[in-house]
Design a protein with these regions (language model features):
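Conserved alpha/beta-hydrolase "acid-adjacent" motif
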Residues: 215-221
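Conserved alpha/beta-hydrolase "nucleophile elbow" surrounding the catalytic nucleophile
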Residues: 95, 99-104
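Catalytic histidine-centered segment of alpha/beta-hydrolase-like enzymes
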Residues: 239-250
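Conserved HGGG/HGGXW glycine-rich cap/lid loop of the alpha/beta-hydrolase fold
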Residues: 7-66
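Active-site loop/oxyanion-hole signature of alpha/beta-hydrolase fold enzymes
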Residues: 40, 46, 56-96
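Short beta-strand/loop motif that positions the catalytic acidic residue
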Residues: 202, 208-210
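Active-site nucleophile elbow and catalytic-triad environment of alpha/beta-hydrolase enzymes
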Residues: 182-198
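Flexible "cap/lid" loop of the alpha/beta hydrolase fold
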Residues: 105-113, 119-150
Length: 263
């Protein structure tokens, strides 16, 4: 299986590369996602074959990447080097980065810590500032507290919160996550503070995609889009955080392609 090694701490990061001569796009999913989920995401489906080279990456702590149980291993300066290690492994200088939720926050981190490797960012369902107490953050904390040998309690907490039943195959993948790694990831994220600062000085194009009903992150996402010199905010009507995560809205696909092609 293809892995890249993070030079800062030796963490092994799993990736899948579609290859070809197109412009590379690194894609990350959400808090429970593996590359198997990311391949099915709206961001992935938006990429015309041949025009772009999709590189799917498992977050540290998820999928086939290493899963340390120490919260310190999930510091943003370390996490931001994970996809850069993948680019180095593939001999790629610069790429677009597309991420949703947990992946959107990582996108802000990459923009902060490795802007010279970024063509454009698409950050969905997230914001770069410190985490605020909100209904969703309380759901994640409570769900993780209840997890034992797998992530079933967190998956069920999400289903109750969004009043959905996740697709069978995706649900099984999510449940199979390592709860100790998830708790370490979450503990560090809540304690760490901003994923990125000095947004007014950024030169990287950044599309922020939010559900108009995402009460947890919308205000801060609007603030970030206003601060970024090349920032743009796309609101998906009648979508909460989860609905935006799985959206295949034409406006989303058009905005993603416009952002990537213009960079």
């Amino acid at each position: 299986m293809p892995h890249a090694k993070n030079a800062l701490d030796g963490a092994r990061i799993y990736f899948e590369d579609t290859g070809g001569s197109g412009i590379p796009v690194v894609l990350h999913g959400g808090l429970l996602d593996s590359v198997d989920d990311v391949r099915e995401s709206a961001g992935a489906r938006a990429l015309p074959p041949g025009e772009f080279r999709a590189v799917y990456v498992d977050h540290r702590g998820l999928g086939r990447s290493d899963k340390p149980h120490d919260p310190a291993a999930y510091a943003m300066p370390l996490r931001a080097r994970d996809p850069i290690a993948v680019l180095d492994e593939l001999g790629i200088d610069r790429a677009h980065f597309v991420g949703m939720s947990w992946g959107g926050r990582l996108g802000f981190g990459v923009g902060a810590h490795a802007p010279d490797r970024v063509r454009a960012l698409v950050c969905g369902g997230q914001q770069p500032y410190s985490w605020l107490d909100s209904p969703l953050t309380r759901v994640v904390t409570g769900g993780l507290d209840d997890c034992q040998h797998d992530a079933l309690a967190l998956v069920e907490a999400f289903e109750r919160f969004w009043q959905v039943r996740f697709p069978k195959a995706q649900r099984a993948r999510w449940i199979d996550n390592d709860p100790q790694a998830l708790r370490a990831m979450w503990t560090r994220a809540l304690a760490e503070g901003p994923a990125a600062t000095n947004l007014t000085e950024w030169t990287v194009p950044c599309l922020i995609v939010m559900g108009a009903g995402d009460a947890d992150f919308l205000d801060q996402a609007q603030r970030a889009a206003a601060e970024l010199p090349r920032g743009e905010l796309l609101l998906l009507d009648e979508a909460d955080h989860y609905a935006a995560h799985v959206s295949a809205d034409d406006a989303l696909i058009e905005a993603v392609l416009r952002t990537l092609r213009a960079a």
